């Protein structure tokens, strides 16, 4: 079970993703604005943050920058419906865990990506903190 934060200005998509991850046993919080997301990132600890890139008030890239400036190392999966090479490069350079293009199979793709991420992160934590 992991603690996830899902950030997207499209509330219906947030609810769909929230339900999908809750069904898999995860604890899920959502934010439908960048400002709300910033407050949650600053006050809570998450295992993984999933954020849309293009939002009206604060972009997913800006949220990632904010987290890194605050020394928050939580992995980010950034997703977008309007992919560009420059945005992908910027996301990777800032340390995004993954960059995902929103497609018709977004829920399935994201669920699979999150499970892989959590396994990798678990393995990484075990190697950094041996028994």
Task: Identify what each model region corresponds to.
Residues 15-23:
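Charged docking surfaces used in two-component/phosphorelay signaling
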Residues 39, 61-72, 90:
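Short amphipathic alpha-helix used as the core "switch/output" element in two-component signaling
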Residues 14, 56:
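The feature encodes the CheY-like receiver
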Residues 32-36, 59-62:
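Acidic catalytic/metal-coordinating carboxylates
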Residues 25-32, 40:
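Short hydrophobic/Thr-rich beta-strand motif most characteristic of the beta2 strand and flanking loop
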Residues 52:
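Active-site residues of response regulator receiver
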């Amino acid at each position: 079970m992991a603690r996830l934060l899902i950030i997207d200005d499209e509330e219906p998509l947030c609810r769909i993703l929230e339900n999908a991850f809750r069904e898999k046993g995860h604890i899920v919080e959502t934010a439908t604005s960048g400002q709300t997301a910033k407050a949650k990132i600053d006050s809570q600890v998450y295992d993984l943050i999933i954020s849309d890139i293009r939002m009206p008030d604060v972009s997913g890239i800006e949220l990632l920058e904010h987290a890194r400036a605050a020394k928050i190392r939580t992995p980010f999966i950034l997703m977008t419906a309007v992919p560009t090479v420059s945005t992908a490069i910027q996301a990777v350079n800032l340390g995004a865990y993954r960059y995902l293009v929103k497609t018709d199979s977004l829920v399935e793709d994201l669920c699979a990506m999150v499970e892989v991420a959590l396994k990798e992160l678990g393995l990484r934590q075990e190697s950094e903190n041996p028994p």
